[in-house]
Amino acid sequence: VKYTLEDPDEKYSEELALLSKLSIDGVITTNWDDFCERQFPKFNRYVGQKELLFSKSIVNIGEIYKIHGCMREPESLVLTHEDYTDFNKRNAYLAAKLITIFIEHPIVFIGYSMNDNNIKSILTSIVQCLDQDKIGLLQNNLFFVEWNRDTNAEMEVERFDMLMSE
């Protein structure tokens, strides 16, 4: 198993340098690779829900949450249908932790859309715990950056509605 991505293409070096300098509280990723650890080497890394349960951190700043596992720990990977089913059944603490993070901090989803099943599942778990007025607060903290194949496309900002259903 290869534990790291190949060195990024030189044409992205400026963007990667800027990314490393961002003043962010943390990273939540479903990726298994070590890109985030290399970009933010001083951040504490938590792999899956088990590490979160026993972490001593109460700060929630400077942390990387690898919610679908890490290549350095193959047993932690969420990759099969059975893994995802198990993940969804057992993610109560993770959902609670994410609720806190999502409400208290702006969240930028890079490379995901509201149509991504993983994002839908996480947001559904969170929304089910909130009153309608709190859902509005949550909405204001979520930003999605998506890649558009059309190189001539203009930048768009869209609002996504999250509704609570009984």
Which residue ranges define each predicted feature?
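SIR2/sirtuin-family catalytic core signature
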Residues: L22, K42-R45, L52-I61, R72-P74, ...
